[in-house]
Amino acid sequence: MTVSSATPPHKTRILVTGASGFVGSHFLRTIKDDYYIYAVGRRKQHASGVPVQENIEWLRGDLGDEATVQRITEHIALEGGVDYVFHFAGFYDFTNRDNPEYTRTNIDGTRFLLENCLNLGVQRFVFASSLTVTRFSKKDIKVTEKSPVDATIPYARSKQAAEEILTAGRE
């Protein structure tokens, strides 16, 4: 874990996972001036195109490693926790074949994150799933959270399993 800042100001504090990925880095660039951000990514901050600012604390780590998730969340807890979690981290390899990384990152990483965020004072946990989890509908029929699932490829199955972990954690 690498830390690039240390003192959270009075702003609303958020945790963003997948900060060095496509969705996470774009999200960070959009909100970068409005919050104190704990940004978790596998790559270095400069490699992600996320600006270095006092209100962005870059925490380098792999969510598939439970000890790393524990260290990151313990660090955040010592600084007062976070108000919101935006979980964008995930693995996808474009082959549609089974890959153990789907389980390690998408399923186990989500479970590790959820379990370790329980003591952070989180008001809302936002998870970026995938449309591939749902059955593709006929033209002009909306897909919602209540749409039937039809995860047929390994990536979609891993995202569906992560959704189930989060749903069980909410109850």
Regions found by a protein language model. Name each.
Residues 56, 60-105, 116, 134-136:
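NAD(P)H-binding glycine-rich loop region in Rossmannoid oxidoreductase-like domains
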Residues 12-34:
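N-terminal Rossmann NAD(P)H-binding glycine-rich loop of SDR-like oxidoreductase domains
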Residues 104, 139-171:
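Catalytic helix-loop patch of NAD(P)-dependent Rossmann-fold dehydrogenases
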Residues 1-11:
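A short, basic/flexible loop-to-alpha-helix module at the beginning of a structural domain
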Residues 17, 40, 85-89, 125-130:
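SDR active-site strand-loop-helix element
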Residues 112-154:
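Conserved Rossmann-fold NAD(P)-dependent oxidoreductase catalytic core, especially the SDR/UDP-sugar
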Residues 40-45, 63:
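N-terminal Rossmann-fold cofactor-binding loop
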